[in-house]
Swiss-Prot record:
Protein name, as recorded: GMP reductase
Record Gene3D superfamilies: Aldolase class I (3.20.20.70)
Function per UniProt: Catalyzes the irreversible NADPH-dependent deamination of GMP to IMP. It functions in the conversion of nucleobase, nucleoside and nucleotide derivatives of G to A nucleotides, and in maintaining the intracellular balance of A and G nucleotides.
Keywords for this protein: NADP, Oxidoreductase
List of catalytic residues: 176
PROSITE patterns named among the record's database cross-references: IMP_DH_GMP_RED
Amino acid sequence: MFNEIPVFDYEDIQLIPNKCIITSRSQADTSVTLGKYQFKLPVIPANMQTIIDETIAEQLAKEGYFYIMHRFDEDSRKPFIKRMHEQGLIASISVGVKAYEYEFVTSLKEDTPEFITIDIAHGHANSVIDMIKHIKTELPETFVIAGNVGTPEAVRELENAGADATKVGIGPGKVCITKVKTGFGTGGWQLAALRWCAKAARKPIIADGGIRTHGDIAKSIRFGASMVMIGSLFAGHIESPGKTVEVNGETFKEYYGSASAYQKGEHKNVEGKKILLPTKGHLSDTLTEMQQDLQSSISYAGGKDLDSLRHVDYVIVKNSIWNGDSI
C-alpha cells in the first residue's frame, strides 16, 4: 500500500496560481486559530534552546504570535507560566515523558498553562499516549500538542488518546541527523509524509522540519498543515539564544538540534548536530517578511485567507524548481 503513495518534498512541488481577487497583498489575512486562540501567523519557532528563550517567548506572545517554550530548563517552567499569566499572556510549555514529568503536570493545577507540547523524537509511543491521557485527566482545559510522528496510524492513535494536535516530522530538520544515525524518518519526503498524515487527521496537524524557504510555509498549508514549526529560518538572529561566534571578522550564531551532544552535554543517543549560521538581523524583521511572503502566496492562490492555499493545484517537478539558482 505504501508504494502507491506519491513521494516528494518541498523542492519538488510548485503550486499553480489562480486569478487574484485582492488589490493589495496587505488585504490577505494570514491569521490562524489554534484551540481557543487566534494568532497572527501559522508559524511556530522550533522549541529548541538555540531558537527560543523566555524573552523571545514573551515578545512573540505580546505581538500575537504562537510559541512553544522548550523543556530543557525544567525548574524555570512554573515561574515562566506564572510570569506570563501575570502579564495576561498565554503560557505554552513543553514536557517530556519521564516519570517526574507526571508529578510536574499534576502540580500545574494551580496555574494551568494554555498549551502543553509533549516533545520527544519518536512520538508514536506508549509513553506519549500515557502522558496525553495524564495531562487530559489532570488539566482538561489545556490544549495538548503531541509528537513527533510520521504516519497516519500514529496521528490517529495520539488523537484518540486525547491529543488536540499532532506534530509531524521525523528528522527532516537542518540540524537533525536522525535519518543518518538511525535509517528512519521523513527526511527527503517530509511534504509527502505531511500529506499522508493530514488525510487521516481529524484535528490540527503541525508540520515540523524541512522548511528552507518562506514558500514552504504555503506548501505545508496546501498539504494539510494548520501550523508550521520552523527551526533554521528562526535561528541566527541578534536576539537568538545561540552563542555568538566570530570567524574571520564575521559573526555567527550557534544552532544545534534538540537531541545533539551540545544540548545533552554528552555523547549519548545523539540525533542532532551543531552548525554556525551567519547573524541575520532582528527576529521581528524575519516575521514581517514571512507574513508579507505568505500574503503574496494567498494572492497567488486567488483567495483572501489561508484556506485558499488548501485548494490550489500543484505539479511535481522533481528537484528542478531551483533550475541552477540559489537564494
